[in-house]
Amino acid sequence: VKHMQSKVIYIAELYNEKQKLQIEERLMKLYGVFKVSIDIEEGAIFVDFETPANLNNLEKEVYDLGYKIIY
């Protein structure tokens, strides 16, 4: 049984709308990801997803874009 998960990934050095769109586009391409919303001021990425997507591969995608994961 697949179940939806909602997680928040906090990152460093998120400053502008261009970065926000870059991250949203990258994560939305992943199979299993339903929704991505980002709070620039908080440096928070909110993701709704189900299997086969998981928190590790979401964080890796963000890291591969050059962002440091805080927690």
Sequence positions of predicted segments:
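Short, Lys/Arg-enriched N-terminal segments with co-localized hydrophobic residues
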Residues: V1-H3
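Extreme N-terminal starter segment of soluble prokaryotic enzymes
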Residues: Q5-K7
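Short, surface-exposed ligand-recognition loops at beta-strand->loop->(often short) alpha-helix junctions
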Residues: I9-Q19
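Short acidic amphipathic segments
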Residues: E24-D39
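A generic structural motif
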Residues: G43-D48
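Helix N-cap motif at beta-to-alpha junctions
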Residues: E50-L55
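Conserved short beta-strand edge segments in small beta-sheet-based binding/regulatory domains
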Residues: L65-Y71
